[in-house]
Each structure stands twice: as structure tokens, then as C-alpha cells.
């Protein structure tokens, strides 16, 4: 059994990751501001209410943990499209510093296709639409990835394409070669499956694959 801290655990990929981790027999500490609302019941689940931007909360949550899975997300409304966000970079800066202080080395982080060197790799029309709608949000994910890559942590970055609520297929592709990167869709449950598999694997250590359903 591995002790996993999931940050951003109350919904979306984060909630799917908590559920998947529990199914695999791990002890999961589910970190979110609304952790008490997580609709799961398992003896290996520990709810932890906290703010990912507060260093004290994050340091306390790291106590006794072996691995961190960071699954932060934002609601992409009109204001977010126009103004962007600093959530990803601010929370990651707090997390990396806290992990180094607390001696927790393994970080598995969720960003997305379009972050880092996967930007503008979807084809002309896709990239135009993506940059118009998500460009400012992904500018901050670029900073998030840079902070992780620049650290001395044992990191893996997962970059899924467009997320859906379909059931897991377990037939998704993990793509490292930029020549094979393509836009598409992937189930959140499949992304969670990949994230949890990295808890006990170093196959993608210090790599940033694109996940395609």
C-alpha cells in the first residue's frame, strides 16, 4: 500500500484518481477545499480540507505521504478566457517547495495537451481555436510545467487531450513522440488510470507524455 496525496480531489480527474487509487488498494489522502463533500466511502480514504495556495495546509497534508498526484483544474468561463489564471503556477510553486521541505520526492502532475512543448501541435485550425479559448490558461500551465521540470523532484507530467465523462476504456495511448501527437478526446477515468499507475512505475519518470483516448 502506498500513501498518496491527491491535490484537487473533489471533482473531475481528481475525484476519479481518488477512486482509482482506492480501488488499487492504496491509502489516499484527498486534498480539497471541499474535501468533506467527496462522495466516496472507503476505510483507506482520508479527507483533508485545505487550500492548495497555503503553504501550511500543503505541508501538513504531506506528512506521511509517499507520492503526490496534482490534479488542479479551473472552470473556463468568459472571465477566465480573457484574464487567464495564476492558480497552476502559484499552487505548484507552493507544492514543490513544500515537497522539498518535507522530503517527499515523487510528483505526478496533470497539465494538458497544449502545455509546454505540446503547444501549437494540434494543427492550424485546432491551434487557432485552442489559443483563442484556452491560451491564457495554458500560459500558466507552461509556468507550472517549468517549475516542475526545474525542480529536483522525481516527476511525471501527464498531458491529456480534451476530457470527457465517458467510462474508462483502458485503451488510451501514451504518446511521447511529438510526431504522433494529435488532438482528440480521452475519458477522465482513463487519465486517472494512468496517474495511479505511475505511483508504482518509473516508466515515465521525468517525461511528459500526451494521453490520447
What are the functions of these language-model segments?
Residues 27, 35, 78-79, 90-136, ...:
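Conserved Rossmann-fold NAD(P)-dependent oxidoreductase catalytic core, especially the SDR/UDP-sugar
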